[in-house]
Amino acid sequence: TIANFELFYRQSKSSCYYAEVFFPAIAETRREKIFRPRVEQLIKLCEEKAINVKRLFDVGAGFGIFLEEWRKCFPQAQLLAIEPSAPLARECRSKSLEVVEETVENVVGRDNSADLVTCFEVLEHVYDPLAFLQVLRRLVRPGGYVLVSTLCIDGFDLQVLWDKSNQISPPHHINFLPVEGFKKLFQRAGLINVEVTTPGRLDVDIVRNACKSDPELLQGQRFLNNLLEDDSSATALQNFLVEQRKSSHAWVIGQKK
C-alpha cells in the first residue's frame, strides 16, 4: 500500500542510511558532476520551449542541491522543496528553501500553482506511477510543465546486464518503462506535448565496470567486448545511445492543458 511505501521511505534502515550517511559523503561531488549540469540542461530545455519559470516545485528534493543551484541562476524564482524524509527536509531548510515535509500525494493547498514541477529519479520508486503523475499534474498551472527523470528499460546497460544490473533493485527501484511507455503514461495522466529524451552518459561505463568485476559477463560477445575496450568506440557508442533514445537515463516532459 501507499502507507507502507511512505513508512519505508521515512523509517527503513536503507533510507536512513542514504539520507544520513551515504548522500552527505558524496553531496558536493554530485553538485559538480550532476546537479550543475542538470540545471544547465534544464535551462536550455526551458529556453527551447519558452517556459518562463517563476515558480518551481521539486518533488523528492533530497538535499536541495538542485534547487540551490537553480536559485543561483534565478534568484527571484519562487522555489518549493517537497521532501518526505525528515533528515533531507532539514537539509533543505538549512539552505533557506521553503519545504513541505510530505509525500507529494499528501501536499495540500498547492494545486494549479507551479510553472514547472521537476521530479528527478523518483518515478522508479513509487507505488503507482500513474496516480503519482496525476498528482504532479495537479500542482502545475494550466499551460505549465511536468519534467521527470527516471530509468528507462530500453537503455543499453539495463538491456545488456538485465538481472545483473545494480539498478534493478527492489524494493527501491520497481518501475522500468520503455520510451513509448513513458509517452502513454504521461498522456494517460492528462499531459500533452509529451517528449522523451535519453541524455544519459553512463551506460557504456556501467557495462564496462560490470565487466571488470565479472570478466565472464559478456562471454562469447566478441564484437561488443571489442567495442567496449576501445575508448573512442565506447564514446561513439554512448553518443549513439543518446541520439537514438537508447540510454537508460530518461527525461520526460509534458504540458498541462
Predicted segment positions?
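Conserved N-terminal segment of class I S-adenosyl-L-methionine
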Residues: 1-120, 130-133, 198-199, 211, ...
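A structural micro-motif
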Residues: 77, 97, 144-145, 191-192
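Acidic/polar helix N-cap motif
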Residues: 111, 125-128, 178
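Short catalytic micro-motifs in class I SAM-dependent methyltransferases
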Residues: 120-127, 149, 172
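A short glycine-rich, Lys/Arg-flanked "PGG" loop and its adjoining helix->strand segment in the class I
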Residues: 130-145
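Short, glycine-/aromatic-enriched active-site segment of Class I SAM-dependent methyltransferases
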Residues: 147-175, 180-185, 209-213
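Feature marks short, surface-exposed loop/turn motifs that line or immediately flank catalytic pockets
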Residues: 154-156, 200-203
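Conserved S-adenosyl-L-methionine
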Residues: 191-202
